[in-house]
A protein has these predicted regions:
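Short S/T/G/P-rich N-terminal loop/turn motif that feeds into the first structured element of a domain
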Residues: 1-48, 58-66, 77-101
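Conserved RNP beta-strands of RNA recognition motif
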Residues: 51-55
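Short arginine-rich
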Residues: 70-75
Length: 101
């Protein structure tokens, strides 16, 4: 599994309320993204927004982010991390990948 932290600066015309509303509107569309396990939509008071994604593989993540670059014509800041384990207290116990990736 791979965790990707994606960040981008919002245009000045988009405030936190508009960003949150947009995220809530588009969130259901992420249910069918190939390889995506989980996504958290994030924004900060300083005008940055993005997402924390949990992917089955880096290839799945890179394929998705290529589409973002093509659609919006910008490169967000992306950091990739190998994910050794996930504890999600809202659903299942601990999620462990089959092998370290």
């Amino acid at each position: 599994m791979i965790t990707a932290i994606v960040q981008y600066r919002l245009p000045p015309s988009i405030d936190q309320a508009a960003c949150a509303e947009h995220f809530r509107r588009i969130a259901p569309g992420f249910r069918d993204v190939p390889g995506l396990i989980r996504k958290q939509f994030i924004y900060a008071e300083d005008g940055w927004a993005g997402g924390v994604y949990l992917w089955r593989s880096r290839a799945d993540a890179e394929a998705f982010y290529y589409g973002i670059r093509k659609r919006y014509g910008m490169d967000p800041e992306i950091r990739y991390f190998h994910t050794a384990a996930v504890t999600d207290n809202s659903v299942d116990p601990v999620l462990l990948p089959a092998a370290a990736e």
